[in-house]
Amino acid sequence: TMKRLYIIVEGQTEQEFVKTLIAPYLQKHEIFEVTPILIRTSKTGRGGFVNYQHLKKDAERLLKSEKKDFIVSMFVDFFRCPEVPHKEKWSVKSSHIGQVEEMERCIKDDIKDVRFIPYIQLHEFEALLFASNEGFNSFFDEIQKEKVQQIINSYDNPEDINTTPEGAPSKRILAIKEDYDKVLEGNLIALEIGFSKIMEKCTRFRAWIEKLIKLCKES
């Protein structure tokens, strides 16, 4: 039997993305139960990844069950990511990708469970939107689209788009279109691009999705 999958997310945008893009793709691979879980930061249940302990609590709550018929993963941004354990290990890495990979390892070591797969998006959700100009075409005017195309042309892999605060993917979109609405437009843009194009361009993201499929299929 196929395993269930829970993905801990930091916000509504990621929650929608799991529902509207990741889940339908996984259904093609016969993984039918895919549930995004918003990080609980307070009594109100609002999302946001501001404290590692909140994420850990949510993961451990899901993993408390002894059952082996599910996998728990996470989908959070590297940009503005709060400190995760073992800073001495990940902070010394010189590249962002090195830091992210080490941070994922440190989280894995901290939440010791074979059913748990950490994933941190380099550099943030919006990077995925730069996989193609297709998505922006519907929502941006000609001048805005041209600016987006220049950014797309500068990076083979959108996951490399820089994380200096003003260079972060979301900041770049806001600089082009001031009223960009992350939750609504972000996912509509992603839907326009299509999941296969995002997978093709964003190699770390693709590796994560492929790993989830493999683990959900393992007996």
Residues covered by each model-derived region:
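C-terminal accessory helical subdomains adjacent to catalytic cores in phosphodiester-
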Residues: 1-2, 15-41, 56-219
